[in-house]
């Protein structure tokens, strides 16, 4: 629509802290702090919408093609339109948008009234940009993929993304693989924080959109599915332009999350746990490596690595990822009596035992699926299940390439599944296990379910997943609480789901390229150690600082723990993990390979236990208030219950590095590494060394 048809309007709201101006096209053309520069380089459309009209699932609404009314009321900008226009015509859908100034924050609210025959499937609002710089530099994007990433020079990174499926943009779903509903631009001490305020946890997406010209726009997408005749109010969003650190944004998000997130207090033994020694007793393809009577010997291997918990996968009749969700105790592995006896033997040695169950997928060849699963599976828009495939193999190319076992994802809104998960938890506890490990319940793809016979909240496909899963968590937690010591663990990390388990496994984070922390997929200068090169870097601090009391293991599908992985886990407060998954791993452990790694892992576990008030039960503070004069040495703070702080250091290089660390008020006079300890603060930290600096 040409500008000559618009009523020219400039809507400005401001106070002593923030100025915002919206033009007649509904674009934010000015956003600044008091006396600061305008961070909007080129205004962009404030919203988009994706409609389903007839058989067209991409009937797109662009903000700059609408006839908008823009006005000011007090400290709010009001934007409205009575009809939406797409390239195919006019739709009877009305919008009412509000941008409200609250102190130094901006609150974005919106309402959609649908009197058309279309369904508004996706509502993309707000779109904040285009931003070239916040304070003269090249902004980095802090993005909550898994535990967190920092994407250096996000504008240049997006400019270089020319692949067909993600041209000049990144976008992922929440909840999972995104762990939180906030992201942040950081530029030389200036931050722009954008956060969702969605306590229903709609299936959503967070996008950073660039272009071949550069710049970045931050966007939020809510999968709304607003049907004909429905009026829908979108959960609010909050934007905050401020001077300071990303940690202020994290604290703001944590404060809001405290209004709905009530995490359990983990069992004492889980808090003090150093690591999980995972074993697949029987594989999907039928190979049996570890009968039940080998559990005490397996625990001895675990102790040799400094681990205190034995986690059993594939302990049931059909093997790991064999028959989901209804396994039986394996007769060929020894039967129920032998399983119970050997669990007790491990516990008699001071160990703990967890038993694995699948919490989300159903084997399409199982009796359960044929009798019940078809009714409760999550359905696509075509009415078919959401299929996933899994292959397990060791030496066989056939199993690797041509034996993908199909599974159907359950719709977690179905009560039948809640009851089944609770019964399975009861059964596992009756076998004498200390914990049940329910796979996938902490996250995984939040599929919208289109089976209208299921009891989805508000009849929304996008509320079928998270809302149903929250009820599953509560059911399982009820079973665990019947005992004073039984624990509940699950995989994957999200803010919504991490409040129920005692511990999460499979952190989705790893050390990255040595000396840089750069993610492995990044090539070019980043792979050579140039950390200024555009691209993603691992930043587990993002989730760990926001929710420091959440206990997490570091995913490690290998039969040993490398020195770098152990140091990485120490730095970020992850519990260790390793896995024996096939016959090759069995040979590795029986042949006594990996001696150096095993010794170091055991020494590191002793260090953690000796200083467990910091390293196992303390609060992770990232680098808050810490001055580190050597960026080659990674550092993080931990706070124990009495408020004292200690620092963990890791030299992820191949050379000695000087230690230059200070914290106001700290009286550090001692240090300890996995191999040795001493007084004072050492001048150097050795290559691939880690240490704790603390007050004795």
Give the location of each predicted region.
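Polysaccharide-binding surfaces and accessory modules of carbohydrate-active proteins
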Residues: 8-11, 18, 31-33, 38-86, ...
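Polysaccharide-binding and catalytic clefts of secreted carbohydrate-active enzymes
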Residues: 165-171, 178-179, 185-190, 198, ...
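Solvent-exposed beta-strand/loop surfaces of large extracellular or lumenal domains
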Residues: 202-216, 669-684
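Active-site-proximal substrate-binding groove within the catalytic cores of carbohydrate-active enzymes
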Residues: 229-230, 234, 467-674, 689
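Active-site-adjacent "subsite" loops/lids of carbohydrate-active enzymes
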Residues: 287, 291, 338, 352-431, ...
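C-terminal beta-strand-rich structural cap/linker in extracellular carbohydrate-active enzymes
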Residues: 678-696
